[in-house]
Amino acid sequence: MANYCSNSVRFIGNENSVDAVRKLFDDIDKKQMRSNRYHMPDFVKGGMGYMQDIAVGPSWISYETRMVPNLEVLDDIADHYGVDYIAWYQEPMAGLYGEAVRTAGETQWVNIDTYTQKGRGNNPAFFDLKELQASLLIGQHPER
């Protein structure tokens, strides 16, 4: 499939909730492999529910989507389990790179346009996002 968007996400919150999210992604992957169809849980209402090549690790979950990240799906999952997240995504063929943070029910993101280099550098939104990411990771164990 052309125009994959590679996504990596780290969910942050209560350890049991984060473990439940990791199990959810494992379950999605297993259901998709068994049925050869895409699957999303019923509580996911936003965005495109397309994910493939899901890899669940101790700290990060990685997967592919079509062309763009599916932040709305991540929002629904985070809200359902009461966790926050930090996400990175890239679609090199379209020059799309970005980062997102969801905390306290709000998602902030910065897309980086590689063709004009807009979005990074002196962009205050990018630096604000990096500070928000750092504040979420304070006190987190490296394996989480």
Give the predicted meaning of each segment.
Residues 1-144:
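Intrinsic low-complexity, intrinsically disordered or marginally ordered coil/linker segments
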